[in-house]
């Protein structure tokens, strides 16, 4: 894996009245720090079957690369990663199958590990996709599973993405979220610091580009809040360590300095599976019997 590349964001002198902004004060004086933003951004799509993950990934990429169709059964079978250049950055988009299903099976466990490998060393943003007007008990279970699988801290890197934005019929998404009587949705929006945006996945041209710009503003906000860092946990750290070890061993072999007896992929994937299993058990214990 390549090291993260960063670009420096020049600091401007803000207007005097902004010096009293309580949000900036609580964030630790971001204006006083030299901020970093990575050139390569990893965005991983999460959500229940039928939420529109793959279609949203296609909208972000500006082309149809992930299979997407209306179906009650999962269309995406395995995690996939595709990328595009946008505004001087490389956006890596990882589409996932229903890895947050409450029915954990060996197949789901393997799919989780595959998603971790594809998004290593960690995602800069998790895009939690849900259909407008359809935030149900199943979505609440997805939110809980997201925390069980990746850790409670993952919500600090999560953006709520509503699909079928066109159903607002010209109305405001802000008004919809603010006025919702769905308490679980309202709680989640507040927990995510109101990081939400909407996608009409049939949009083209400027409308599609405007949606992406809005999403990337939310991603940029996450980068500021986390000083440019991606999300990581034990499973991601283990994966990255193995990537680096493999690269080092391959380099030594090519230079005639090492042994060709490199541990196989199956061996370290078994280790990843065990670490992930233990992490999920710990996260589940931490969450206890909370509502989400």
Swiss-Prot record:
Q: Which Gene3D superfamilies match?
A: P-loop containing nucleotide triphosphate hydrolases (3.40.50.300)
- Residue pairs linked by disulfide bridges in the UniProt entry: none
Where is the region Disordered?
A: 1-39, 250-275
UniProt GO cellular component terms: cytosol
Q: Which InterPro entries match?
A: G_AIG1, GIMA/IAN/Toc, P-loop_NTPase
Print the keywords alphabetically: Cytoplasm, GTP-binding, Nucleotide-binding
Where GTP binds, per the record, is at 47-55, 68, 164-166, 201
**Annotated tissue distribution:** Highly expressed in spleen, lymph nodes, lung and placenta. Expressed at moderate level in thymus, kidney, heart and digestive tract. Weakly expressed in other lymphoid tissues. Detected in T-cells.
Q: Which residues form the AIG1-type G domain?
A: 38-240
**Which PROSITE patterns does the record match to this protein?**
G_AIG1 (PS51720)
Q: Name one GO molecular function term.
A: GTP binding
UniProt keyword Kinase, yes or no: no
Q: Which domain of life is it from?
A: Eukaryota
| Main subcellular location | cytoplasm
Q: Which family does it belong to?
A: Belongs to the TRAFAC class TrmE-Era-EngA-EngB-Septin-like GTPase superfamily. AIG1/Toc34/Toc159-like paraseptin GTPase family. IAN subfamily.
Q: What's the protein name?
A: GTPase IMAP family member 6
